[in-house]
């Protein structure tokens, strides 16, 4: 059963948005995902001193950054390395990749087809990601991109699939992004002004996610590969790796 537990899992930082814990989700075998192990988020470079004091309490061991190198150069890495986290950059989209995606699927915004295009950039990122997930020493993990919704959403959907969460839970977790959109747009508008070409409505749309995107993505993975686990097996993630991830992240 999917319940509305957003308030319990969302961490409301002043200068960082879409930051939440995936703990507590129930899985098909009756287990639940452990709290305080895996956080998903957007960029952290605008965190305030108050935010950073709170972030220390999370004791993040590994920061997995899914952004392109040019995004990192522009935005910086945020404070977690200084707080003791090991930093890993796994660029889901390489520099120039957004333009290639636009050519492949059209510049139609967030879509399942666009998410499927992430897989066409190669398997190395996904194999490395799940090997990181399989090492208990890497936890707690913070996984993020810029907005914490697309690259982070796809990665988290894969992980939730491996852990045995059903599609309703995966959909609901993905859509929780929309719960922090208004606060994020308020922050941008008040501190920087809206980007050129955007009004408040279009900015809200850009910062949010449509349910069709994750549904179409996972349907596409099912059609192409047989499902997320089948895709991950195909690229080299082993049964032993899956087992270690479940042992780390699931309650008994």
Give residue spans per PLM region.
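Cys-dependent protein tyrosine phosphatase-like superfamily
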Residues: 1-142, 154-252
């Amino acid at each position: 059963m999917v319940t509305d537990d957003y308030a319990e899992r969302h961490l409301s930082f002043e200068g960082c948005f879409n930051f939440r814990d995936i703990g507590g989700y129930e899985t098909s075998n009756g287990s639940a995902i452990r709290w305080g192990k895996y956080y998903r988020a957007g960029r952290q470079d605008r965190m305030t001193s108050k935010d950073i004091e709170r972030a220390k309490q999370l004791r993040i061991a590994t920061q997995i950054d899914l952004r392109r190198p040019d995004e990192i150069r522009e935005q910086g890495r945020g404070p977690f390395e200084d707080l003791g986290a090991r930093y890993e950059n796994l660029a889901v989209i390489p520099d120039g990749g957004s333009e290639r995606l636009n050519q492949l699927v059209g510049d139609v915004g967030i879509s399942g087809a666009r998410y499927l295009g992430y897989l066409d950039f190669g398997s190395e990122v996904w194999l490395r990601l799940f090997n990181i997930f399989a090492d208990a020493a890497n936890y707690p993990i913070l996984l993020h991109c810029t907005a914490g919704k697309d690259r982070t959403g796809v990665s988290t959907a894969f992980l939730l699939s491996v852990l045995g969460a059903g599609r309703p839970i995966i959909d609901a977790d993905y859509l929780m992004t929309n719960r922090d959109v208004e606060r994020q747009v308020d922050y941008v508008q008040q501190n920087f002004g809206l980007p050129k070409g955007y009004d408040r409505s279009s900015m809200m749309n850009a910062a949010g996610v449509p349910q069709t995107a994750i549904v179409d993505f996972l349907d596409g993975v099912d059609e192409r590969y047989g499902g997320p686990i089948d895709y991950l097996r195909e690229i080299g993630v082993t049964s032993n790796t899956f087992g270690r991830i479940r042992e780390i992240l699931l309650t008994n």
